[in-house]
């Protein structure tokens, strides 16, 4: 198996849904199914924070979400936990700057998809040189979902990555809504990653569909 091609990775990032059991006010599986029906292109399992599942419950829940993603042929990515990604034979893993280093992650994951959160050009270049398939850049806007976020980058911060010659696929993250999606794409992102814009929406299906429309219109 060869590593994913840039064009394919870029398309997969269009509507990137991130979710754990504690990001929903109703059945997470129902939310994910609606989102998949609405046009999610890639999914990340992120089970963190207050009230999150641990141990066997966490693994079982991850498998349920993974099974659903497989039905839709949507890649299933695990946040941070490389060992869980290997155990589940996930499609990939996403790591932050405080998680396991990209070099050892690439060694363990083989040719699977690896995404890395980058807040500076130096972090971005290091990640790319050591095997990142895409970058998560942000937070673009203020967000309440993550408590330990870095300083808000704004769309100017995102555009700066492109101005500095970063050509790998980029997904914008942090405070992204249907209303500000166009600005994120126009600044140079290949897609948007969201949690609450889908997980807490009245209709996960409608919200995802509108996000997908905004991305396609702005690319």
Swiss-Prot record:
Condenses 4-methyl-5-(beta-hydroxyethyl)thiazole monophosphate (THZ-P) and 2-methyl-4-amino-5-hydroxymethyl pyrimidine pyrophosphate (HMP-PP) to form thiamine monophosphate (TMP). This is Thiamine-phosphate synthase. Its cofactor is Mg(2+). GO terms for cellular component: cytoplasm. It comes from Bacillus cereus (strain B4264). 4-amino-2-methyl-5-(diphosphooxymethyl)pyrimidine binds at residues 44-48, 79, 117, 146. GO terms for molecular function: magnesium ion binding; thiamine-phosphate diphosphorylase activity. GO terms for biological process: thiamine biosynthetic process; thiamine diphosphate biosynthetic process. Its EC number is 2.5.1.3. Belongs to the thiamine-phosphate synthase family.
């Amino acid at each position: 198996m060869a590593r994913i091609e840039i064009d394919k990775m870029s398309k997969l990032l269009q509507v990137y849904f991130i979710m754990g059991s504690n990001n929903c006010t109703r059945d997470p599986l129902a939310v994910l199914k609606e989102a998949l029906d609405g046009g999610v292109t890639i999914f990340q399992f992120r089970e963190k924070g207050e009230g999150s599942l641990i141990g066997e419950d966490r693994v079982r829940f991850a498998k349920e979400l993974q099974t659903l993603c497989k039905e839709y042929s949507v890649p299933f990515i695990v946040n941070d936990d490389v060992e869980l990604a290997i155990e589940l034979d996930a499609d990939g893993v996403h790591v932050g700057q405080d998680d396991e280093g990209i070099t050892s992650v690439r060694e363990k994951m083989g040719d699977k998809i690896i995404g890395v959160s980058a807040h500076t050009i130096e972090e971005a270049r290091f990640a790319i040189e050591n095997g990142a398939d895409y970058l998560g850049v942000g937070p673009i806007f203020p967000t309440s979902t993550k408590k330990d976020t870095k300083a808000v980058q704004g769309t100017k911060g995102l555009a700066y990555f492109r101005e500095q010659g970063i050509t790998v696929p980029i997904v914008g993250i942090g405070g992204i809504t249907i209303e500000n999606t166009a600005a994120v794409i126009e600044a140079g992102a290949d897609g948007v990653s969201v949690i609450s814009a889908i997980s807490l929406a009245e209709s996960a299906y409608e919200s995802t569909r509108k996000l997908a429309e905004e991305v396609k219109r702005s690319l």
